[in-house]
């Protein structure tokens, strides 16, 4: 197997003051703070840049479907189903590994409301509350699960899948280490 030094990038986490110079065939690897891998943004931070990137991609997909949202011959329930299958699937890609903060949860809810308002053709100037928008969505489709709930459910499903498996992923996720401590009070060093 050959490793290309031009294509290979180096990303590190929490390495302040540590020399991270790696060479392949006397060529130094480029150190980066973020890169795209399989459609996901990998960064040396938490998952906020990835979630914001997914939100931007979702908004772009929503705008590309504007002729569908403005078409009066398509029923409202069909538009919601189209949004769920075409738009939110972009957002939910790899959501199982996200770290959700309170700020990011609010942003996810706001983005979902923006999508529904775009479909319903409701402007913020119309002063329609989020509860009224949710009621209209609930009327159109009976079983409605908001986006944040879907993300949380997928995270739990993924955790259950990994915790039932045997192997390195389970060991890393649960932080279990082979061995143990001796009984009694531990010695001071």
Predicted regions and their residues:
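Short linear motifs embedded in intrinsically disordered, charge-biased segments
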Residues: 1-189
